[in-house]
Amino acid sequence: ETAEILYIPGWWRNGPHDDLLTIIGGIFPGTSPRLYRWDNLHSWKQSVKNADAVSVRLAEELAAMPEAQRNRIILIGHSLGGRICVRTLARLGERKLRIRQAILLAAAIPDDDPDIPKSFRGTAAPILNLCNPYDVTLKYGYGSFGEQMRPPLGINGCRDRHPLCFDIPVPDTITACTNLSDRNRLMNLNAVKRVANHHARFYLEYLRQQIGNDFAADAPLMVPQDKVNLEFPVMDRKLFWTE
């Protein structure tokens, strides 16, 4: 059966999203992805509250669908849109309802949020969590000022490995081979793209490239982030501590 795809944008990203919807349609041939709008044109603090509120509404909308239709739904959420996906799936899981799948792009939700493990029960296929340890916005914006300086899922990936959540680390090199804009040449300068690497286009482009391939082939080393963006040191596998 053909999937029904809803794309949920992040903060201050309410459209148009024709370019992103086209990319998503290319990843899932035969589908017509739709934009799921929500009230995100506010301050960050208010938009976080709105994201949590709209997740309840979306869960109710999905729960009210005929089961056959709900089983075709794929949610794709970027940044706060990823947060909405997690909260929505958690509410569905509590009611023993499921959609087909969810794809998280740079999800702006703490990596220790209790709704994350609950969300695994809300999909039939594993959740794909595209994360980037080098995401500038998440690392220096969200990680430093958002929600008690707790590191986000979009940087660290899932803390507890689970067969229904597949972390896909996006390499920092994706910015070099992806155009950020089809119209503005300035936006395609490498310096601009590296700073703007939170943009959904980079995450979707990597997903498109890797569909059907080995996601781990060029994946970066995932280094968990601590509070205030202090990275845990990486110990060489040949080095052992002895008493």
Label each PLM-derived region with a short phrase.
Residues 3-159, 221-223, 228, 232-242:
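Serine-dependent carboxylesterase/thioesterase catalytic core
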Residues 138-243:
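C-terminal catalytic-base region of ester-bond hydrolases, centering on the histidine
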